[in-house]
Design a protein with these regions (language model features):
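Glycine-rich loops and low-complexity Gly/Arg-rich segments
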Residues: 34-38, 65-68
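Short, well-ordered alpha-helical segments
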Residues: 4-37
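A cross-kingdom feature marking charged/low-complexity
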Residues: 46-70
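Amphipathic alpha-helical hairpins
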Residues: 2-5, 9, 25, 44-46, ...
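Alpha-helical structural elements
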Residues: 1, 34-35, 52, 60
Length: 70
């Protein structure tokens, strides 16, 4: 196994369709600008309520991505 070094960044993924989709949306979007994303950690879960029903989900994530070797 090779030694790896990771950088960690925090994002918030959102979705009206649920927590799972908010995670997927956040990772998919981050993957457009970050390479080598290997793991995530959920740090927060919250949502927006409108007229007594859940309107939108927000999930705070830490993403770990590998630094490239020279």
């Amino acid at each position: 196994m090779t030694n790896r070094t990771y950088r960690v960044t925090e994002i918030v993924g959102t979705s009206p369709d649920g927590i799972d989709q908010a995670i997927r949306n956040g990772i998919e979007r981050a993957g457009q600008t970050l390479r080598h994303i290997d793991w995530f950690e959920v740090t927060q879960v919250r949502g927006q309520v409108k007229d007594g029903t859940v309107e939108h989900y927000q999930v705070g994530l830490k993403l770990g991505f590998r630094l490239e070797d020279d």
